[in-house]
């Protein structure tokens, strides 16, 4: 087989994880069967570790499925036959069944009830030397106090979280408000500049109209002069009109 075959690397990790999970499962079963041998903290820790290990094994089995798919896509590269692939698939199937059996036993109603009873006993600090009436009252009194402390702690955490969210929202609102103020000032300045430019354009338009009117009058007068006779008055009139035109142009440039 090829040295690059990734199946055996993942398979070794899965086998180690299964051995660890089986040890945890055995300890977890012992704790539930004999409540006097452990505290509630040990049961909770063992239960969480067992669940995490089973979940990790399931993920590793998915990786093994992917390696088989890779090998099946290119069998020549890994030099594997159908028999070897069947063996690998059988390993994945059997391991997955082992994990499923442990998860099923952990999720049965009887086991859950036993675990709850053990947690309740550890919380209450059960003692066989007390009589029924006194022991029962003390148990439930301690249970109520523990529940009240747990509820108070939960409420405090929720209030602190809500306060943090409110503070973050206030900071965001302040940032948004500042941005809106900046945009408002910018829009006001832009609006004022546009109004000033509009007034300037309007004045310039009036000046152009006035100048155009003056030029039209001059052109009309020049047209009339062109029809005059070529005597001395004609030349005088032309000179005068030319002077007027020159003055108008100078005024236009000055204005």
UniProtKB/Swiss-Prot annotation:
Q: Could you tell me which residue ranges the t-SNARE coiled-coil homology domain spans? A: 163-225
Q: What molecular function terms (GO) are annotated for this protein?
A: SNAP receptor activity; SNARE binding; syntaxin binding
Keyword Acetylation among UniProt keywords: yes
SUPFAM superfamilies (UniProt xref)? SNARE fusion complex, t-snare proteins
Q: Where in the cell is it found?
A: Golgi apparatus membrane; Golgi apparatus, trans-Golgi network membrane; Recycling endosome membrane
A GO CC annotation recorded here is:
cytosol
Residues the record lists as Phosphoserine modifications:
2, 129, 152
Supply the alphabetized keyword list: Acetylation, Coiled coil, Endosome, Golgi apparatus, Membrane, Phosphoprotein, Protein transport, Transmembrane, Transmembrane helix, Transport
Residues annotated as carrying N-acetylserine in the record are: 2
Q: What is the protein's membrane topology class? A: Single-pass type IV membrane protein
Name the segments for region: Required for interaction with VPS51. 2-168
Which SMART domains does the UniProt record give? Answer: t_SNARE
* Transmembrane parts of this sequence: 235-255
Keyword Membrane: yes or no? Answer: yes
Q: What does this protein do?
A: SNARE promoting movement of transport vesicles to target membranes. Targets endosomes to the trans-Golgi network, and may therefore function in retrograde trafficking. Together with SNARE STX12, promotes movement of vesicles from endosomes to the cell membrane, and may therefore function in the endocytic recycling pathway.
The entry's family comment says: Belongs to the syntaxin family.
According to the record's subunit comment, the protein's assembly and interactions are: Identified in a complex containing STX6, STX12, VAMP4 and VTI1A. Binds EEA1. Interacts with VPS45A. Interacts with MARCHF2; the interaction promotes MARCHF2-mediated ubiquitination and degradation of CFTR. Interacts with MARCHF3. Interacts with GOPC. Interacts with BLTP3B (via C-terminal coiled-coil domain). Interacts with BAIAP3; this interaction is increased in the presence of calcium. Interacts with VPS13B.
Task: Please report the name of this protein according to its UniProt entry.
Answer: Syntaxin-6
Q: Which organism is it from?
A: Homo sapiens
Which gene specifies this protein's sequence? STX6
């Amino acid at each position: 087989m090829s040295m690059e075959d990734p199946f055996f690397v993942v398979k070794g990790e899965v086998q180690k994880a299964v051995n660890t999970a089986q040890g945890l499962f055995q300890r977890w079963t012992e704790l539930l069967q004999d409540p006097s041998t452990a505290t509630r903290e040990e049961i909770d820790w063992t239960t969480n570790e067992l669940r995490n290990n089973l979940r990790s094994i399931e993920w590793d089995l998915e990786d093994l499925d992917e390696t088989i798919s890779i090998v099946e896509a290119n069998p020549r590269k890994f030099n594997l036959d159908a028999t070897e692939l069947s063996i690998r698939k059988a390993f994945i199937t059997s391991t997955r069944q082992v994990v499923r059996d442990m998860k099923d036993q952990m999720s049965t109603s009887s086991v859950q009830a036993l675990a709850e009873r053990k947690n309740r006993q550890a919380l209450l600090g059960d003692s066989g030397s007390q009589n029924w009436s006194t022991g029962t009252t003390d148990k439930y009194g301690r249970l109520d106090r523990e529940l009240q402390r747990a509820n108070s702690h939960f409420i405090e955490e929720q209030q602190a979280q809500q306060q943090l969210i409110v503070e973050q929202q206030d900071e965001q609102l302040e940032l948004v408000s500042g941005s809106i103020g900046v945009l408002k000032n910018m829009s006001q300045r832009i609006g004022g500049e546009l109004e000033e430019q509009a007034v300037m354009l309007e004045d310039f338009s009036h000046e152009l109209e006035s100048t155009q009117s003056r030029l039209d009058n001059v052109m009309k007068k020049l047209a009339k002069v062109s029809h005059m006779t070529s005597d001395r008055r004609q030349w005088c009139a032309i000179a005068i009109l030319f002077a007027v035109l020159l003055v108008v142009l100078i005024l236009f440039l000055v204005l």
